[in-house]
Amino acid sequence: MGLLSIIRKQKLRDKEIRCLILGLDNSGKSTIVNKLLPKDEQNNDGIMPTVGFQIHSLMIKDVTISLWDIGGQRTLRPFWDNYFDKTQAMIWCIDVSLSMRFDETLQELKELINRDENRIGYECAVIVVLNKIDLVEDKSELHRRCLLVESELKCLFKPDIRIELVKCSGVTGEGIDNLRDRLVESCHFTQ
């Protein structure tokens, strides 16, 4: 391997962004990851819940992003801290169709934020995805739920922390392009 090859590989690695996808079980994390992937890499045979973690790489606007899809089952949550080393972004996925789980998901996020070794919001950009918008038929109810979550997030995070909020559907793909854009922008914010 020549020196130029080594330099090129290092430049690619330097541009690589590590992004964790976290949230409660069945919030649609794996489905969102699947939609973020190029069409020829998407799984169209049905998405299974993640046990442990899965890593996928994709290129968005000349930036290589390593997506770490971490399982959200209650038994896996205590291990989430172990994944934050060298992480530039976190996507926190909320199932907006199940308002009865808002308290649980916000409590888990609060506990994660309060462990300051993660540096969430400072060294690690935060994107909160309100997923499954396609399952809330009443658009005024969807708007109300989004405002509720946004209000709660403002209470969780310090005012100097920038949070991106994205509404999408991992199934229909609505909002996925916006998520791609926010992901790249957030990663530049932390560099």
Swiss-Prot record:
GO biological process, one term: tubulin complex assembly
Stated role: Implicated in yeast microtubule function.
Native species: Saccharomyces cerevisiae (strain ATCC 204508 / S288c) (Baker's yeast)
Secretion signal span: none
Keyword Lipoprotein set for record: no
Pfam family, one: Arf
Any Gene Ontology CC annotation: cytoplasm
Keyword field: GTP-binding, Nucleotide-binding
Gene behind this protein: CIN4
Molecular function GO terms recorded: GTP binding; GTPase activity
Name assigned to this protein: GTP-binding protein CIN4
Note: Present with 468 molecules/cell in log phase SD medium.
Superkingdom assignment: Eukaryota
Binding site for GTP: 23-30, 69-73, 131-134
Gene3D superfamilies: P-loop containing nucleotide triphosphate hydrolases
UniProt-listed InterPro entries: ARL2/3 (IPR044612), P-loop_NTPase (IPR027417), Small_GTP-bd (IPR005225), Small_GTPase_ARF/SAR (IPR006689)
